[in-house]
């Protein structure tokens, strides 16, 4: 309310007062005093904060400050931005987002409660409160690698953003090692196969990890293999030695072993040796001379259950076939 008087304090009605207001406030540019010399000045604004209102007549001026406050009834999520992404999915390292709450005209709203939700198993505080500038930091952790959708809500206003958690290579481990093909021929070409799977401590698949491989009993394998995006890698092992071989996959201090079996190659069965074990028996049709035959494949692996044909000349008698022992 402005009051206009003459130099001796007498009220002056019908006087035109010029009015100005800053900080985006709106006011009538001139107003006229009532008979009692006063005039009500109405000031509106869509901008929260202090506005200086100045009333002037002739060369006389007075100013007062008025305050406009943001409209909590129209509180909304004005923005939601990711400020830190690609944190390790260890349940401790956090991805960060910043929400900003304003009223319908963009004025920052402090002290507002924002509800927060996060998908894919991520953990976050269910509510956060805005600072004086209308912003609030949102911390999200997870033990699950992948994308988590974070949603901030106030009133009926919501915004969502995706954050990514990555598996923790520091805790890489052999989660499992399984035999996918066994009992291959010990010919140095046919392979037994195993599949290793590498994860972090929380079971998240780790791609691009180098796994060391060892195999005993003369088996040949690549010394290292690299995991695919799903954390798995195929391990191929070959051998020229029949029998059981232990295959061991290692990463960091984590190790797993499985046995595979190579079998002798019946396709290359051969008489490896034939030796006389008893000689000079009496020729009475009963006392026998004996021999021992050994059958192997091309790489010297013994072959059991193989039928060997036998011939003897000069009238000697023998079984026409014999079968090799284990």
List the predicted regions and their residue ranges.
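The feature marks long extracellular or luminal low-complexity segments
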Residues: 1-326
